[in-house]
Amino acid sequence: SDVCSSDLVLRTLVHSNLATHKPVLFKVLNTGLQVLVQDQGRHHVASLGVGRAGALDQSSFVEANLIVGNPKHAAVLEILNGGLKLKVIQPSVIAVTGALSELWITYKETGKRQASLSQPIALDEGDEIYLTRPKEGLRNYLAVQGGIYAEQVLGSVSYDSLAELGTSPIQVGDQIYSAQLKTYPVELNHFAQTKPKVGDEIIIDVCLGPRTDWFSKDSLKLFFNQRWQISAESNRIGLRLSAEKPLVREIDEELPSEGCCTGAIQVPPNGQPVLFMNDHPITGGYPVIASVAAYHLDLIAQIPTGCLIKFRQISDFMDLK
């Protein structure tokens, strides 16, 4: 499908020279698959050809910040499938939310202990943090009191993996700096819920349209009745779905590029849908059969490869012609 291009392909580093006036919080010893700096994302910039990006699981992102007394949209680390290891450079208070991983702290004075998720944890210089691969879910969020510093691009520090815009992915040897944000009294409201695990069947609510009528009635039945597997090629741009029987279009016309939203389910010529995530292209040239209900977007962010998805209709199709 078409992608609206932009000249704003800028990259900033969390260990940039511009950050040297900020206190160093951590040194990165290991990153696992991917560690990104994310905040609430970029809003009101679609006209520039720039997507939202931002934390995929917004509720876990906000929860992590509130636990340590940060403003709810302060920058955090988004950790994909565990593996993060950090060395503490100066005393800090952290919280880790999201996927059900084991959080291990090796205290300089007292040795290795398992710590609780969704709770504030005080750390001293020389301590080490390690996050295991999740048993449930896919992404964790690590907030530190005072926030994480990175340079903003178009009002956000978030990394957009499609446009390569924003703070570059964290690498071994990087230093994480404090944003020195004002903090607030902590209110512990634990909103952690059970996360999907490999083998689970996940029900996702969708609204039909805008191009549902481009598909045959049999294909629409298949869309709801089949169980869709998540491909290992899925990423922050989109979940690639596959099933035994592909969806068949009833209208074979060329579709002009049109705007797409996070959660849009686009169907390319092979009939195997792609569910757009936060880093999706602003426009698409394939028909969108349905879109995920907003309240299930956080759930989508936590579904690991090996789960099955089944879609559930919550609204009727309305032809807006």
Model regions: which residues?
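Conserved "landmark" site that anchors the functional core of diverse proteins
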Residues: S1, S6-K321
